[in-house]
Amino acid sequence: MNIQFSFRRFWHVLVWTLVYHWRQLLTLFSAAFVTFVAVEIIEFIQVSNDYAYKIFNHKSHEAIVKGALHDCSNGCMSFLALLMCIGAAFAFYNLHRKNEGRRLLMLPATNLEKFMARWVVYVPVLFVLYVVAFMVSDVLRIVIWPVFSEEVSFPTAIPEFFGVMKYLVVWTSTLHFYKLLALWRKFWLFHALGLFSSVWIGRWAWLFVTIVFFAVTALLLRGNYQGWDVTVFYLLAIVLAFAAYWLFCRFPKYKLFHNKD
């Protein structure tokens, strides 16, 4: 593997990847937008229908609205994690065709630069697109909300959404970082749906391990929490990332092309 890295070549490959994949990115953006609009409308309609009952039970308007915004943000964040997995699964999907693989190999850049360009497009760039999709969907929900209910109105959920975004670090970012590094040379051996399923299962397994880790440390500390377990957790994630990269360099030879044109 040629490990030479040029930022100039990388920039050209990154621009080429963005231009070449704009339709796929637009499709993912549109799917995220529709999903977020649906989640917000369904959540707030349900809260609006139960509004009178909650007020009757002496629950304040502020508490009802805050709870609705929190639940809506958590729901959208969960779907964002799901959409990130879908985007990662389709990052190298087109390499299952001969012409697509040849076109990528003919680019005047190293394999590392080509991979990093795809990683940047389908992880941080796609994440930003999803966040923008949520913000646009939230504005649209505010505009069209009077059509669904005039009894109670809900403010923007954007601040609450950014408040719960910290969970995305555990759910997706670390997972994608070392999963993609370890699996990118094998992506063309799987259908995108199969890859997505494996990543989705891995995401929930990683989340389960995270919950167990913090629960066990909380029980052991019993009130003497110092925050060191968070540091240990992220150090472990970094070690796993480098281990996956080592495996990626250790086993570089895989079948590249299928028989499809």
What are the functions of these language-model segments?
Residues 1-102, 111-261:
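Hydrophobic alpha-helical transmembrane segments of membrane proteins
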